[in-house]
């Protein structure tokens, strides 16, 4: 019985260490969306591998938020598959169809370090994917590539 009681803390320590190690490449960033009185939280999937999985975009209203409580009023969200590690989330002007787009970037796990990105626009009650690019060179102009993708999508209609 004594031996089992000693083994239990050791087993817990191993499980806790494994859970922490699986989350070393996690990503969480809050991005202000001031024109809509919103804030977006972009986060990679918990306990997923670094090289593949998903990320979430959660949008909260800040219209009536007290300081420090800007993620209390959930409005909408989106879940997107990813092939690589989420590296950044930021606002960008992508032209007339997406003047205040939320951009999420990823870097592939392969030797080329290729870059991909998705652009989202928000409304008072929705978040919508407007463009996606993949396989870009590591030093590519992501905003320009997304603008071009939006233009192609518009011309295809």
Task: Pin down the residues of each PLM region.
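Bacterial N-terminal signal peptides that target proteins for export
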Residues: 1-8
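Exposed acidic/polar residues on beta-strands and adjacent loops within beta-sheet cores, strongest
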Residues: 20-157
């Amino acid at each position: 019985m004594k031996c089992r009681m000693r083994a239990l803390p050791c087993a817990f320590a191993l499980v806790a260490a494994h859970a922490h190690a699986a989350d070393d490449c996690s990503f969480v960033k809050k991005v202000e969306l001031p024109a809509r009185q919103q804030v977006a939280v972009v986060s990679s999937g918990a306990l997923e591998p670094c090289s593949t999985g998903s990320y979430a975009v959660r949008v909260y209203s800040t219209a009536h938020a007290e300081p420090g409580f800007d993620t209390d009023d959930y409005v909408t969200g989106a879940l997107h598959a990813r092939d690589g590690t989420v590296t950044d989330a930021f606002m960008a002007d992508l032209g007339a169809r997406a003047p205040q787009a939320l951009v999420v970037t990823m870097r592939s796990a392969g030797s080329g370090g290729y870059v991909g990105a998705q652009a989202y626009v928000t409304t008072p009650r929705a978040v919508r994917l407007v463009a996606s690019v993949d396989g870009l060179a590591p030093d590519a102009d992501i905003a320009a590539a997304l603008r071009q993708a939006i233009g192609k999508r518009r011309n295809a209609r």
